[in-house]
Amino acid sequence: MQIQQWLMAKPEAQLDYPFGPDPAVFKVQGKIFALLFRQGDTDCVNLKCDPQQAIGLRDLFAAVTPGYHMNKRHWNTVKLDGTVPDGELQRMLDHSYTLVVRGLRLAERRGLEARHGRSALYGSEA
């Protein structure tokens, strides 16, 4: 699945299954930035999001809803049904990762920056 490859390509991304075989949990420095799971017959991903952007994305895409089993202000669930363009989905993945990295303790964040560079961690949000 392409989304799993995108998620694992993020610097120091780790895949974990703390809740059993579903969901697949993606972390950086022990902090979750994405959860990949099935809801019925559809693959979905939970992604962290700036609250204002979260609302805008929900208005723009029917496949984007408040985060399933998450803080609905800060997380969106995206149904991977093909209705969200790949470029937009990748931007959402990058944004989620960036928000989590920015929320890390200073020493953890600086360590990541030293090992990978700011552009690898923050992309266009650097």
Please place each PLM-identified region on the residue numbering.
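Charge-dense, helix-prone N-terminal extensions
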Residues: M1-A126
